[in-house]
A protein has these predicted regions:
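Cysteine-centered motifs
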Residues: 16-17
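A short, hydrophobic C-terminal helix/tail in secreted or cell-surface proteins
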Residues: 361-365
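Bacterial N-terminal signal peptides that target proteins for export
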Residues: 2-11
Length: 365
């Protein structure tokens, strides 16, 4: 077959559309525009698997993520179901639990992955400091989720975390992300963040500070010594800086910091090993301070919630410095409602995909 005049951006549409997107596209190409919206044809679940058993092959898996992002966006707010293994996007459709929502993801790449930084999870009940394992052999704060409620579309993701009765939703701007959590009634609801978490390894060192009763900021330094791209062979060396706000006051917050020995390997499989998880699970909770730095740290803010009360976390990201993260936050997402962010993300996709659509030429032979 021969194709003419199909720009690169259309490849995304073809990959993400049901039935390759050709049915909907050809209808409008004949002049019947109707209420056509290109974003309606995007299916982020296409390719969202790392399962060799489901695919029947070892190579050629999709390894995409279903979470929210914008065209060419630096931020991808997506569910993560697994940390170790051959798992570049952090998510695989057949997994039955979610361990959190990260703000950076790789998509469609081979080899062992990277990113998956700033892992945020809403929880209730007693605090747990590890996600545990997807196979259930080690428990933690990860939650089963209802596949029937899992929804993904251009610039938006949602799922019901059934272990907690919490609905989680995500959307994004080019340099920021937003999470909306709808909680059940309870006195021990929380948002917790694993700053060490990284797909295929861990951040080598992390830092977080409480700026005020709504704001946190910090960074995660990731190097080849602690895994990541190609389990360290890819020589990925980067720092993710963040500036985040929670709309519910942080009046009861704390940190945990695990004492990781100097001689411990902290790569792809080691960070989900029994000794490593036990060490993190035993980390002491620290309160009464406003900042902490270490090799494996976490943060939580705890509060009471009414039935169906919504709590929002917004975060700006930078790969340059903390000031850049703050500026991105203030320029793109400060004070914006979740629905506004999701609507604007969808509009960005419609605008980008419409450009590709107008240049679409179907196969000539």
């Amino acid at each position: 077959m021969h194709y003419r005049n199909i720009p690169k951006t259309l490849l995304f549409l073809l990959l993400c559309c049901p039935s390759m997107g050709l049915t909907g596209c050809s209808t409008t190409a004949q002049g019947d525009t109707g209420s056509f919206s290109p974003a309606d044809y995007v299916n982020p679940f296409i390719g969202a698997s790392t399962s060799t058993s489901a695919a029947g092959v070892y190579h050629g898996l999709g390894k995409t993520f279903p979470g929210a992002t914008t065209p060419y966006g630096m931020v991808q707010v997506s569910p993560n179901t697994i940390t170790g293994g051959d798992n570049s996007p952090g998510y695989s459709y057949e997994h039955t639990t979610i361990e959190g929502f990260a703000f950076t993801q790789m998509s469609g790449v081979g080899w062992f992955g990277d990113l998956g930084n700033l892992l945020v999870m809403p929880t209730t009940g007693p605090l747990q400091k590890i996600a545990g394992r997807e196979d259930g052999s080690i428990g933690g704060y990860r939650s089963h989720y209802d596949k029937a409620t899992e929804t993904a579309r251009a610039g938006y993701y949602s799922a019901l975390l059934t272990d907690y009765g919490i609905r989680a939703e995500s959307s994004a701007t080019p340099h920021c992300g937003i999470l909306r959590f709808t909680f059940p009634e309870g006195e021990q609801s929380r948002i917790q963040i694993d700053l060490a978490r990284r797909v295929g390894g861990t951040a080598e060192r992390q830092y977080i500070e409480v700026v005020d009763k709504h704001t946190i900021a910090g960074w995660m330094k990731c190097t080849p010594a602690t895994g990541g791209w190609g389990n360290g062979e890819g020589q990925a060396d980067y720092t993710v800086y963040f500036y985040a706000q929670v709309d519910k006051p942080m009046e009861n917050y704390g940190f945990w910091r695990a004492d990781i020995p100097d001689d411990w390997v902290r790569k792809r499989d080691e960070v989900v090993s029994v000794p490593y998880l036990q060490r993190v699970a035993a980390a002491p909770v620290v309160t009464g301070i406003d900042r902490i730095e270490g090799r494996h740290i976490g943060f939580y803010t705890e509060f009471g919630t009414r039935q169906d009360e919504q709590v929002i976390l917004r975060a700006g990201i930078s790969f340059v410095d903390m000031e850049g993260a703050r500026k991105n936050f203030e320029a793109e997402i400060a004070g914006k409602a979740f629905d506004q962010v999701a609507r604007e993300a969808r509009e960005l996709w419609n605008r980008e995909l419409a450009v590709s659509y107008t240049h679409l030429t179907l196969p000539t032979t």
